[in-house]
Every structure is written in C-alpha cells, then in structure tokens.
Amino acid sequence: MFSRNHRSRVTVARGSALEMEFKRGRFRLSLFSDLPEDTELQRKLDHEIRMREGACKLLAACSQREQALEATKSLLVCNSRILSYMGELQRRKEAQVLGKTSRRPSDSGPPAERSPCRGRVCISDLRIPLMWKDTEYFKNKGDLHRWAVFLLLQLGEHIQDTEMILVDRTLTDISFQSNVLFAEAGPDFELRLELYGACVEEEGALTGGPKRLATKLSSSLGRSSGRRVRASLDSAGGSGSSPILLPTPVVGGPRYHLLAHTTLTLAAVQDGFRTHDLTLASHEENPAWLPLYGSVCCRLAAQPLCMTQPTASGTLRVQQAGEMQNWAQVHGVLKGTNLFCYRQPEDADTGEEPLLTIAVNKETRVRAGELDQALGRPFTLSISNQYGDDEVTHTLQTESREALQSWMEALWQLFFDMSQWKQCCDEIMKIETPAPRKPPQALAKQGSLYHEMAIEPLDDIAAVTDILTQREGARLETPPPWLAMFTDQPALPNPCSPASVAPAPDWTHPLPWGRPRTFSLDAVPPDHSPRARSVAPLPPQRSPRTRGLCSKGQPRTWLQSPV
C-alpha cells in the first residue's frame, strides 16, 4: 500500500525504511518536495505532452504532403523535449536527495565553491554547403528530387528547432535564416546541432504518384494524346475513384532521418562567421540522403550576464589625481569590464556621461588596504592597470568594512567569470533578438514547364494580333481616322493600347493562323441591322490613300466578331 502526499507530489511506501526515518525525525518530508524550478520544469513537461497529442491528431488528419511534413517535424521536436525534460527532472531529484541526505545539519562541510555567472548563447547565419555530383547537378534534366530538412538544436535541457527548408539540386547550400537564442547557458555549455531530412517524393507519399506517371505519359505519347490521358487520370483521381493505371497509394506519415550532427562549445564562440566540421550519420542508400560537404558555417555569439548587467553599485570616494587629501564622492557601478563613477545615482539610469571610468580587465590588479584610522576613512581599494610602460592606480574608499568586502567580492567574482567565459569577456558581442516564426510556406509546384503550360489552338485572331503588336512595340498618340466607322459599337479599343498599332497584314497570302472568324447572320447586333445602316451618316470623303488605310486597317477591330 502507498500513501500519497498530494501537496508535495511524493509517494512513500508504508512500512518502508524511508517512512521509519521520517517517524524517527531524521528526515523531513519537505526535503523531497518539489522545488520552484522543478515545478516549472514539470509544467513544461506537461505542455509538451499535450503538444505531442495534438501533433499526433494533426498528422492523422493531414491530406497534403507539406502538412504531414510539418506535423511530423513537430512530433519529433516534442518527443525530444519530453525526453530531455524527463532526464533533467530525474537528475535534479537525485541531486536533491543526495545533497540533503548525505550529511546532517550539524556537520560543517567546506564552503560552497564559486560558480560562474550565466549567459545567453545565440547561433545565426546557419549554412550547410552541398556537394552535388556532375550526373546529378549538370546532366540530370528529369524531375527534381526534393528533400525537407531542418535543424534541431539542444543546449542542456532546452531544445529548439529551425524552419523547414526544401532542398533540390538547384541549391548549392542549405541556408537557415532564423536566429536561435538560448537564454540560460553556462560557460561549459555544449550546443548540439542535428540535421534531419526527409525525402518529399518518398515511397508511400500522400500525393504525386499518379501525376508523375501522367506527366511521363504525356511527354512520351505526344501533346494531344498525352493531354487526353492526363485529363482522364486527373478526372479519375478527383472523382474519388482509383486511377486507371495505379492503385490507391497507402497513406502514411513521412519519416525524418538523422543526416549529420556536431557539438559546439565555448571555444567555437567568435564574433564572426566560422566553419565547423559535421559528423555524417547517413549513407547513400538512405532515401533521405543528401550530398553534404561535411561542414557547417555559422556565427556563434555569447553574452555573459556580467557583461550586460551591473554586478555591484554603491557610494565611493575617489582620490583626485595629484591631490592626497582631496576626495570626490561618486556613485560607482561595476558593469562589464569597467567601473563607472557617476556624480549622482540617477545619472546611471538616464545614460549620462560618467565622471570617471576605470578599466577592470583580466590584467587589472586589485588590492584592499587601510589608511590611518584617525582620518575617519580607513577602508580603501586600489585598482591598478598597465598602459604600455606606465602603471595607473586609482584609489577608492568605502563607507564601512562590509561595503569594502562587498566590493572585493564583486571584483573577485568578475575576475572568476572572465576566466571562465574567456574571449566572451573581451568585448560585448552583438546578439539579435530572434524574429517571430513565420508560418510555413506552401510547397511550390515542381515539374517540367512544358507540361504546366496550357497550349490551346490559336484560332483567335485577337490573341495573335496582341502577340504581334507586343513584338512591334509601336504606339499611336491619336486614333487612326478609320476608327470612326466603329463608333457605334458598345466597346471601342483604346487608341493608346498596343493593339491599335499592329502592322497591316497582307491578305493576299494565306494567313499563318488559319481562317479568320466571320460575322454570323443570326447574331447581328441591333446597331448593325440593315435599317440602322441605311440611316447611318456617310463617312467623310477620303483620299485613295486613306481608303487604302481603311481597307488595310487594324484586323482586330474589323474582323473580330462582336458575338
């Protein structure tokens, strides 16, 4: 039998040795209760479990390949986060039990070791070059094989991912535009990068098999026959029945494969672009295999908190240069590699220029000393820096011994952080805040442009006239005089349009586009009836040259049927 403490979420067996220790008073049940950080981790774990359930339902309801790829990617990320959170939660529980039960409260152990500050780590400008073969990149003129790839990044128990990228042989590298930021990292961090990929045209794909076969048939049988076969296949697939030549494909979710991975540490941090080696984890027989070059290019930056946030502040007295008895009272702020001295505490918040700036770097020497106590200022702090052959020393005074100890502790902690974060404390590296993730773009149609073009018989003389006038490119500022014959029509062509300046064709030769359209006797409009023509005013007298222009005018206006 078990008794559960619902408040602390601890299960203790009745009659067990642990319960006997509780009764004897050696242990307290609160030692095994959840800490605030453990509660937050448990909340994240519950959230990812719900996200995984939603991803499974979404994957089962997907009807398009791109939707299935995104759902499978979300499912893989959720599973990775769940495993990471469970492992971290178990590790914290074990450390909590071992740390609090290994020694009794009366035991006096060694003081706690100094720990470095935390920081932020950001990776951006991720590029993975590809190495295509000549037969695949230059000589392959068939259908494009496509892959869907993304990066999974893990730092400690935190896992993030990039957007999904579609890759084919037209790309020379895989470029990820998003910046990935980890807000909680130590100087001993290990950032693991994993590249996952899935073939878009994988066997068992949701769509695409019958269409690819129809494309091949249309190209092999010819334009007319192939178009009829392709139309029959499309109609069969759209009506819900099975295609004529292929059975219904088996619906199954895509599968991502691990293609390559690498691990980046503090040594890889640099305020610039850098290349790192990749460990390939896939072979050429894998359907998701990509010709990776074996390296990844990125910018890895880090910002320790000691470089971006103040570590100590308080009232100080600074000795003026060359004056032993003249001390100026300032407000000191230790931030990054500088000790800023302001006239007033408000100046630090408003961004005013400091009165004095004292450098504090890895080469700085700090010494605490005491002057004559009769002067009333016994607690001093000396900061020395070497500038070439000269040594500059600034002497500071604190108000009490506790304030002096506080400043010394802050300075020693800063020196320890510099020794752990190394090159990250030379200067502040720029880190951009990641932009919100954009929704995934729909997959673009791929295939031959020849089969995607709708080629119809060119029996419309208006379409041919537009093509000819676009090639000529000439324009008329005013409409031609023969356009007055067609003023009774409801829609007139624009005189500035390219169609009004088409060259006059020679009607003595057969037309290359076939027989033009003619007027139908059954479809004469009311304004073109014989009665309307009998009362219409006669056109003005024209010269023979003008009459020639009327007879050889724009074919679009006098040959096109108004029906």
UniProtKB/Swiss-Prot annotation:
One of its GO terms (molecular function) is GTP binding. Residues 96-116, 518-563 are annotated as: Disordered. PANTHER family: ANILLIN/RHOTEKIN RTKN (PTHR21538), RHOTEKIN (PTHR21538:SF19). Interacts via its C-terminal region with the TAX1BP3 PDZ domain. This interaction facilitates Rho-mediated activation of the c-Fos serum response element (SRE). Interacts with SEPT9. Specifically binds to GTP-bound RHOA, RHOB and RHOC and inhibits their GTPase activity. GO terms for biological process: actomyosin contractile ring assembly; apoptotic process; mitotic cytokinesis; regulation of apoptotic process; Rho protein signal transduction; septin ring organization; signal transduction. SMART domains: Hr1, PH. Pfam families: Anillin, PH. Keywords: Apoptosis, Coiled coil, GTP-binding, Methylation, Nucleotide-binding, Phosphoprotein. InterPro entries: AHD (IPR012966), Cytokinesis/Rho-signaling (IPR051364), HR1_rho-bd (IPR011072), PH-like_dom_sf (IPR011993), PH_domain (IPR001849). The modification Asymmetric dimethylarginine is found at R230. It comes from the Eukaryota. The gene is RTKN. The modification Omega-N-methylarginine is found at R14. This is Rhotekin. Residues 17-98 form the REM-1 domain. Highly expressed in prostate, moderately in kidney, heart, brain, spleen, testis, placenta, small intestine, pancreas, skeletal muscle and peripheral blood leukocytes, and weakly in ovary, colon and thymus. Weakly expressed in all normal cell lines tested. Overexpressed in various cancer cell lines. Mediates Rho signaling to activate NF-kappa-B and may confer increased resistance to apoptosis to cells in gastric tumorigenesis. May play a novel role in the organization of septin structures. GO terms for cellular component: actomyosin contractile ring; cytosol. Residues 309-416 form the PH domain. The modification Phosphoserine is found at S30, S106, S232, S520, S529, S543. The keyword Coiled coil applies. It comes from Homo sapiens.
